[in-house]
Amino acid sequence: MSTEETIKQQIESNNILLYMKGNPEQPQCGFSAQVTQLLMSCGQRFAYVDILSNPDIRSTLPKVSNWPTFPQLYIDGELVGGCDIITDLHEKGELQALVDAAGKGADENAAENADSSESAAE
């Protein structure tokens, strides 16, 4: 499977997916930390991919998404945006609605690793 196919499969397989630097327990940049905190505050399970552990995804995703920076949040297969957009949506109360609609029935405040090439997270 090509890296582009892997990315598309990850996006299609996860209702809420965050491509980030590090993981939710140990974000490796302030923007990833902020978005993780905002998602956790919404109380729905989300998947993540640590782009620092997967340089192929890190280099390919901006071409697939037409979005140059990280983190990148996908909800129901659509790119929502990066840190500034997610923060703005949160401040307007819109992020909660998006996350709730996508995450119905999921465990609260949990994250799982969507990158099958890495070991599963807690």
Predicted feature locations:
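Short catalytic-loop micro-motif centered on adjacent basic/acidic residues
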Residues: 47-48
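Short hydrophobic beta-strand segments in globular cytosolic domains
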Residues: 80-81
